[in-house]
């Protein structure tokens, strides 16, 4: 009986990991200086991220993909203005992560499920290149 409960917790906690927000985080981090990215979150503000496509994007895949786009150019460290814009984008993305977490927590019933989901999300964000 306990095993079935744990599987249910794990399944609901995995819901947070498989949201589209992880894709946005990876995309924002790999293309931090691109001007088109600042409109990405603004376009999606009215939509419900939890019920949308829940595909997992590997961090390794995103990193390799962004490097393939500029094979001959060296990636220079961001200038002061680019670093400022990058930090703003990261703050927006993390704010969106908080919103997603709150929406997901509202769908869970018990405090145990909510705690498991928060722990899972914290671990995922700890592995994120944004932090």
Curated annotation (Swiss-Prot):
A GO molecular-function annotation: syntaxin binding
Protein name: Putative gamma-taxilin 2
Organism of this sequence: Pan troglodytes
Family listed: Belongs to the taxilin family.
């Amino acid at each position: 009986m306990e095993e079935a409960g744990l599987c249910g917790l794990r399944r609901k906690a995995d819901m947070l990991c498989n949201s589209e927000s992880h894709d946005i985080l990876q995309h924002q981090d790999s293309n931090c200086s691109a001007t088109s990215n600042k409109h990405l979150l603004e376009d999606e503000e009215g939509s419900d991220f939890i019920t949308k496509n829940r595909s997992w994007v590997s961090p390794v895949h995103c990193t390799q993909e962004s490097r393939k786009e500029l094979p001959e150019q060296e990636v220079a460290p961001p200038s002061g203005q680019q670093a400022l814009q990058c930090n703003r984008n990261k703050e927006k993305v993390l704010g969106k992560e908080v919103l997603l977490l709150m929406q997901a927590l509202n769908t869970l019933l018990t405090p145990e499920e909510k705690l498991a989901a928060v722990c899972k999300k914290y671990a995922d964000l700890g592995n994120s290149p944004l932090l």
